[in-house]
């Protein structure tokens, strides 16, 4: 097991305990049956900007966007739960997992861990419905996610990782507006 995967459970525990301290509770957002608590949005943004300001200089392709407007525009409340869950899972399993070694070199591991841990908290709380009546909604969200993933896979892996990480602000802004944070 790699060092990065060994540290994630410890960091998750720290985040969980930290969120239990009075006065440090995170914000709550909900949409339909989706609800997330324990997210400290200002700290999430601060962590993102710390990492982005370090790695964004590597993004040489400014004409390509992975989180295109058609991925995030006109998303229904029910659909948002599925889409946010899929995007966060992709970021954790693909982008953050493969970006960890670069982050260690830049010495912004603490901010990176804050960002990853908050994504874990949000994703673990988003529980899209498995009800068959929701199938058309989940399929629509899946199609939106596939647009994002296809754009990611069309790029060289390293370029795609930098690009995806640089677009975390687009994802956070969408979630913030969508859930009225």
Swiss-Prot record:
Biological process, per Gene Ontology: apoptotic process; negative regulation of cell population proliferation; positive regulation of apoptotic process
Task: Indicate yes or no for the key word Chaperone.
Answer: no
Subcellular location per UniProt equals:
Secreted
Q: Name one GO cellular component term.
A: extracellular space
MF term (GO), any = cytokine activity
* Organs and tissues of expression: Selectively expressed by Th2 cells. Expressed in the liver.
Q: What induces it?
A: By IL4.
The record ties this protein, via SUPFAM superfamilies, to: 4-helical cytokines
Q: Which family does the UniProt entry place this protein in?
A: Belongs to the IL-10 family.
Function in brief = Multifunctional cytokine mainly produced by T-cells that plays a regulatory role in immune response, tissue homeostasis, host defense, and oncogenesis. Possesses antiviral functions and induces the type I interferon response during influenza infection. Signals through two receptor complexes IL20RA/IL20RB or IL20RB/IL22RA1. In turn, stimulates the JAK1-STAT3 and MAPK pathways and promotes the secretion of pro-inflammatory mediators including IL8 and MMP1. Intracellularly, maintains endoplasmic reticulum homeostasis by restricting the eIF2alpha-CHOP pathway-mediated stress signal.
Q: What is this protein called?
A: Interleukin-24
Instruction: Specify the taxonomic lineage.
Output: Eukaryota, Metazoa, Chordata, Craniata, Vertebrata
Q: Which gene encodes it?
A: Il24
């Amino acid at each position: 097991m790699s060092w990065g995967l060994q540290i994630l459970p410890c960091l998750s525990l720290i985040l969980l305990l930290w969120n239990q301290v009075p006065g440090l509770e995170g914000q709550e957002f909900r949409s339909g049956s989706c609800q997330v608590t324990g997210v400290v949005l200002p700290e999430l943004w601060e962590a993102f900007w710390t990492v982005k300001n370090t790695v964004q200089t590597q993004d040489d392709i400014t004409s390509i966007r992975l989180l295109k407007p058609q991925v995030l525009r006109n998303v229904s409340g029910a659909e948002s739960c599925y889409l946010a869950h899929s995007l966060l899972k992709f970021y954790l399993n693909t982008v953050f997992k493969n970006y960890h070694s670069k982050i260690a070199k830049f010495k912004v591991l603490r901010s990176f861990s804050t960002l990853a841990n908050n994504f874990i908290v949000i994703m673990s709380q988003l529980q899209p419905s498995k009800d068959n009546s929701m199938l058309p909604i989940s399929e629509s969200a899946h199609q939106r996610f596939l647009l994002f993933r296809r754009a990611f896979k069309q790029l060289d892996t390293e370029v795609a990782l930098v690009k995806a990480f640089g677009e975390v602000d687009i994802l956070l802004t969408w979630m913030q507006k969508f859930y009225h944070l």
